[in-house]
């Protein structure tokens, strides 16, 4: 059974077609880049997978289930905009995650915080933007999920923070799960990607292994993307 299957999925906002007859299969054990220009349909696809939107037509299956209560148990989602209460202490947020998610590994979260010399007694609002992003990623990656969906995990942080975030993703990745990373900073993440999905005008225009794309095109993923989308 595939981890994710999208069959003829279409999503409209009024008359605007955000996703157009999307067919997609994702297997376990992959780190996948979901790449496309602004307005291409990336966020819509992510919201559909997370049961935040419902398709107008077609079917989405995650481990054989339609998006809902059961799939939320196995998906760990990092949205582009935070949902955390910055007045909470870090240890309070960790307790919240522990209470809410059966697969949350408290010891992993504290170990990752320790490596950054972050005091769990600190309130989130006292942290820099980069540190807040790291804490949010730590919370997401401390779950033992089967599918991680990260929406712009390295957006708005400095290069050193990006390296830490990518390293955290890799070290907490296991072969029984897959990770979908949506980002516009392709050159920063392409080294960790097993596969890439290019989406344009609501359609999947390419889904290929990273190595195969580099071999066939003779270009980096970032270079190929810029040429195809004229960025």
Where are these regions (language model features)?
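The feature captures the beta-strand-to-loop junction immediately N-terminal to the Walker
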Residues: 35-37
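ABC ATPase "signature
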Residues: 207-208
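Conserved ABC transporter NBD signature motif
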Residues: 58-71
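Catalytic Walker B motif of ABC-type/P-loop ATPase nucleotide-binding domains
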Residues: 148-152, 157
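Helix-to-loop junction immediately C-terminal to a conserved catalytic motif
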Residues: 50
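ABC-family P-loop ATPase nucleotide-binding domains
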Residues: 80-135, 143
